[in-house]
Amino acid sequence: MSEHFFCSSLSNIKSSDWNECVGNDHPFLQYEFLYALEKSNSANTKTGWQPYHYIEQENDKIISLCPLYIKNHSFGEYIFDHSWADAYHRYGINYYPKLQSAIPFTPVTGDRIVLNKSVKDKKGKQVQVINNIIQEAKKINVSSLHFNF
């Protein structure tokens, strides 16, 4: 039986567990890179990149993950959605905070929903992860959910 949760810091996760799921194909998804952003205070609440990573475990093994950040602005995304924020504001709706899956400060492409190679039903697991993240987005009352690059 698997369980999922959201974590506000990678310091709560073992680097070997994270990297086993990620593999070697995406260096910007590696634990060391993302955690360095946290440790250097580049990705935190003050900079508008509050980590809120999705992690699913089964038998103490990470079987899926998604790097997520609670964003209070659109800086450092390489997506220019300021007009969206302005439109929300004109209609009296808050655009921020939003929940975003991205690699901070870089437009690098790659997987955002990462599945352990042991997962058999890849499509089914991706749908489950997305549904879990959507439920959490509603629960924490963010305006929207974004997946970049």
How would you label these PLM feature ranges?
Residues 1-149:
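N-acyltransferase acceptor-side catalytic subdomain
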